[in-house]
């Protein structure tokens, strides 16, 4: 029944972690989280994953099939881990676009890669995954690592990624997922809701952002659901690979 105080046009809500918030507010709240943690994002990734995030990303790159001369889009590219590696793979005849909706994360990534001297074939673009500002059929490969769970309309973002890919192009989605056994799931819950906020407090003086991280992982679609979303968007040959007992999964789809 419609609440008469809200009228017939109440704004739809979505989840921000375990909270329900108006859709128009989620992007702002996510931006605040990443603005808070941007400076120490890489350090926290190493601490929270025990360095495993580097192996997960390496496997994703291996699955991508990126080679010299390719054009690659790395969405939610943050501090540039994937972009730096793709830059070497595509070489001087290729191009990497590092896109992120968050200005603070984009600045950290740009400064980091410029300092390392690997930004010659990398373009930095502030962009919304749901409305990618690129031409149709433009990229050989699109990646998004640990970013899709923060997107308000995931289905729209996946369709946008399909649009900008060339026929035969690959989408790789690396994201936290659902552990494949109960024992690991219980241990992971204890770790996520106790250690992660504590580490956030000690290292970044921000426990709430890492509590959101734990909650956002639980609200993200599981492996089969995300696979179905990619198929529904129009991708062919969609597969996924579980890593670390399903704590993380990488999905791959091909544009027909």
UniProtKB/Swiss-Prot annotation:
GO molecular function, one term: 2-methoxy-6-polyprenyl-1,4-benzoquinol methyltransferase activity
Role of this protein: Methyltransferase required for the conversion of demethylmenaquinol (DMKH2) to menaquinol (MKH2) and the conversion of 2-polyprenyl-6-methoxy-1,4-benzoquinol (DDMQH2) to 2-polyprenyl-3-methyl-6-methoxy-1,4-benzoquinol (DMQH2).
Entry keywords, A to Z: Menaquinone biosynthesis, Methyltransferase, S-adenosyl-L-methionine, Transferase, Ubiquinone biosynthesis
Biased composition (Basic and acidic residues): 1-12
CDD domains cross-referenced by the UniProt entry: AdoMet_MTases (cd02440)
Statement: the UniProt record of this protein carries the keyword Transferase: yes
Catalytic activity: a 2-demethylmenaquinol + S-adenosyl-L-methionine = a menaquinol + S-adenosyl-L-homocysteine + H(+); a 2-methoxy-6-(all-trans-polyprenyl)benzene-1,4-diol + S-adenosyl-L-methionine = a 5-methoxy-2-methyl-3-(all-trans-polyprenyl)benzene-1,4-diol + S-adenosyl-L-homocysteine + H(+)
Family membership noted in the UniProt record: Belongs to the class I-like SAM-binding methyltransferase superfamily. MenG/UbiE family.
Pfam family, one: Ubie_methyltran
Protein name per Swiss-Prot or TrEMBL: Ubiquinone/menaquinone biosynthesis C-methyltransferase UbiE
EC number: 2.1.1.163, 2.1.1.201
Ranges where the record places region Disordered: 1-21
Binding site for S-adenosyl-L-methionine: 79, 100, 128-129
Principal EC category: transferase
GO BP, sorted A to Z: aerobic respiration; menaquinone biosynthetic process; methylation
SUPFAM superfamilies for this protein: S-adenosyl-L-methionine-dependent methyltransferases
HAMAP family in alphabetical order: MenG_UbiE_methyltr
NCBIfam families in the record: MenG_MenH_UbiE, PRK00216.1-1, PRK00216.1-5
Pathway(s): Quinol/quinone metabolism; menaquinone biosynthesis; menaquinol from 1,4-dihydroxy-2-naphthoate: step 2/2; Cofactor biosynthesis; ubiquinone biosynthesis
Domain of life: Bacteria
């Amino acid at each position: 029944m419609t609440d008469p105080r809200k009228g017939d046009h109440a704004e739809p809500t979505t989840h921000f972690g375990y909270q329900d918030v108006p859709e128009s507010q989620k992007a702002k709240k996510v931006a605040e989280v990443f603005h808070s943690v941007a400076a120490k994002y890489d350090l926290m990734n190493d601490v929270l994953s025990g360095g495993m995030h580097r192996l997960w990303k390496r496997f994703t790159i291996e699955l991508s099939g990126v080679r010299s001369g390719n054009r690659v889009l790395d969405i939610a590219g943050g501090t540039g881990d994937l972009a730096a590696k793709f830059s070497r793979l595509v070489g001087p005849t290729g191009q990497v676009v590092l896109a992120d909706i968050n200005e603070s994360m984009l600045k950290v990534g740009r400064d980091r890669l410029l300092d390392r001297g690997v930004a010659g074939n990398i373009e930095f673009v502030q962009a919304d995954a749901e409305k990618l500002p690129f031409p149709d059929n433009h990229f050989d490969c699109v990646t998004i690592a640990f970013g899709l769970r923060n997107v308000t309309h995931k289905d729209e973002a996946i369709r946008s990624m399909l649009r900008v890919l060339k026929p035969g192009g690959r989408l790789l989605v690396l994201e936290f997922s659902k552990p494949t056994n109960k024992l690991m799931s219980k241990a992971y819950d204890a770790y996520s809701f106790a250690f992660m906020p504590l580490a956030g407090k000690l290292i970044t003086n921000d426990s709430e952002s890492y509590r959101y991280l734990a909650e956002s992982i639980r609200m993200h679609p599981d492996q089969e659901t995300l696979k179905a979303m990619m198929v529904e968007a129009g991708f062919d040959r969609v597969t996924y690979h579980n890593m670390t007992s399903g704590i993380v999964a990488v999905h791959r789809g091909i544009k027909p």
